[in-house]
C-alpha cells in the first residue's frame, strides 16, 4: 500500500496552541520550545502533528493575529533544523469544536452555514499562503474530528472545496482528510473527495474506547473510578461499552471482531485500508494513545498490538500526546515505561 513518506512516526503537540486552559502568551512561549523539538527528533520521530485553534491565529472578528502565526512559523523552522516534518491541524475553527466539554456548541451548524464556512476557508487561505513553499515538510489537515454521523455528505462537500482551495495555492503540499464520528477508522470508507497523489486518508484510533479512555473526566458517561486492563475478551469490552456509553457505536462492535490483539486492529483497519488501496491513497493515523490512568503493562500491550498493524500495512501515525492532556509521553505518569514506549514507537 502507498505510504505517507516523511510522516511514518510522529507525535502530537496537543495542549500547546490548542486545548489550552486560557489564552496565555507565557504558556504559548514556554509549553513547546526548540529544546522539545530537538528532543523529539533525538527519539527518532520523523514529524510532529501541531493542533492549533483558530483563536490563536485570528481574533473573534476574524482579524489575523501575527504572533499566533509566529508560533507555527517558529515550529516549522525548528523542525527544519532538526530534520522533522510538520502537520498543521486546525483543531477548532470559528463556529465548530469537537470538544465535549463545550456543551453549548452546535456541532451541526458549521456544516450548513455558508458564512461560517467562508471564514474557515479564509483562515485556511492565510495558512496555505504562509506555508506553501514547504511542500515536502508541511502538510495540512482541514479540521479535527467531525463528530456527527449525519453531516457526512456536507463534510464531503466542504472537503472538496477545501482541496480545490489549497491546490490553487499549494499544488504540491500534502492534504490529510478524515471522516466523521470523531475521525473514526470506520468512516474513512465514506470519504468521497477529489484525490491526487498528495491526498492522504486520516483516522484516529482509541479502540477499545473503554480501555483507552478509562476514567476520562471529559466523557460525561465515564465513571471517574472505572478501570479495565488490556487485553480482555471482546465480550467484556462490548459489555462495558454498552453499560457506560449506552450505544454500540465503537469499532469493537464491528462484524468479524472476535478477539483482542494485533488481529483486532487489522480487522478494524480493513475497510479503511480497502478504501485507500482502491483510491491509490496513503493511510495515516493522526491520533492514538492510552490515558495515563491505565496500568502500565496494559499500555505497553496495547501499543505493541496497534503498532504491529501500523507496521504491517505501512500506516503513518502520530502518538497522542507528547506532553500533558492526560496522555503525555514525557509526563511523570509515563516515566517508568517511557523507554519501553519509545522502543515500540
Model-predicted segments: where are they?
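Active-site mouth of glycoside hydrolases
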Residues: 3-174, 179-187, 198, 326, ...
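Active-site region of glycoside hydrolase catalytic domains
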Residues: 7, 112-259, 266, 270-291, ...
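Short conserved micro-motifs at the rims of enzyme active sites and ligand-binding pockets
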Residues: 22, 211-215, 321, 329-330
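Short, surface-exposed loop/helix-turn segments at secondary-structure junctions
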Residues: 27-28, 217-221, 298
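Amphipathic coiled-coil/heptad-repeat helices and related helical stalk/stem segments
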Residues: 33, 268-269, 302
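Short, hinge-like loop/turn segments at secondary-structure boundaries
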Residues: 67, 104-107, 192-195, 218-220, ...
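Aromatic-rich peripheral "rim/lid" segments of glycoside hydrolase catalytic domains that contact
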Residues: 294-345
Amino acid at each position: 500500500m502507498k505510504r505517507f513518506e516523511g510522516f511514518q512516526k510522529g507525535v502530537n503537540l496537543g495542549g500547546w496552541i490548542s486545548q489550552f486552559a486560557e489564552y496565555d502568551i507565557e504558556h504559548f512561549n514556554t509549553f513547546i520550545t526548540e529544546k522539545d523539538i530537538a528532543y523529539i527528533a533525538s527519539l527518532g520521530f520523523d514529524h510532529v502533528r501541531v493542533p492549533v485553534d483558530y483563536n490563536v491565529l485570528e481574533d473573534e472578528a476574524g482579524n489575523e493575529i501575527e504572533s499566533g502565526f509566529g508560533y507555527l512559523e517558529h515550529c516549522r523552522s525548528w523542525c527544519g533544523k532538526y530534520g522533522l516534518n510538520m502537520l498543521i491541524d486546525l483543531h477548532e475553527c470559528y463556529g465548530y469544536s469537537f470538544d465535549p466539554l463545550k456543551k453549548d456548541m452546535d456541532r451541526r451548524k458549521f456544516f450548513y452555514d455558508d458564512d461560517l464556512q467562508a471564514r474557515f476557508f479564509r483562515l485556511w487561505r492565510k495558512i496555505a499562503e504562509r506555508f506553501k513553499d514547504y511542500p515536502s515538510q508541511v502538510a495540512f489537515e482541514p479540521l479535527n474530528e467531525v463528530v456527527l454521523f449525519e453531516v457526512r455528505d456536507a463534510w464531503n462537500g466542504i472537503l472538496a472545496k477545501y482541496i480545490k482551495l489549497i491546490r490553487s495555492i499549494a499544488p504540491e503540499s500534502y492534504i490529510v482528510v478524515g471522516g466523521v464520528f470523531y475521525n473514526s477508522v470506520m468512516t474513512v470508507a465514506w470519504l468521497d473527495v477529489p484525490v491526487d497523489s498528495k491526498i492522504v486518508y486520516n483516522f484516529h484510533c482509541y479502540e477499545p474506547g473503554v480501555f483507552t479512555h478509562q476514567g476520562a473526566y471529559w466523557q460525561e458517561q465515564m465513571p471517574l473510578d472505572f478501570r479495565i486492563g488490556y487485553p480482555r475478551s471482546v465480550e467484556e469490552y462490548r459489555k462495558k461499552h454498552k453499560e457506560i456509553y449506552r450505544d454500540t457505536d465503537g469499532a469493537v462492535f464491528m462484524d468479524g471482531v472476535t478477539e483482542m490483539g494485533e488481529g483486532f486492529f487489522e480487522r478494524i483497519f480493513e475497510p479503511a485500508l480497502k478504501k485507500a488501496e482502491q483510491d491509490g491513497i496513503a493511510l495515516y493515523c493522526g491520533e492514538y494513545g492510552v490515558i495515563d490512568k491505565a496500568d502500565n503493562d496494559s499500555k505497553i500491550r496495547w501499543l505493541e498490538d496497534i503498532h504491529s498493524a501500523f507496521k504491517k500495512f505501512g500506516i503513518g501515525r502520530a502518538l497522542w500526546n507528547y506532553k500533558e492532556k492526560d496522555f503525555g509521553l514525557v509526563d511523570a505518569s509515563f516515566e517508568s515505561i517511557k523507554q519501553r514506549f519509545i522502543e515500540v514507537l
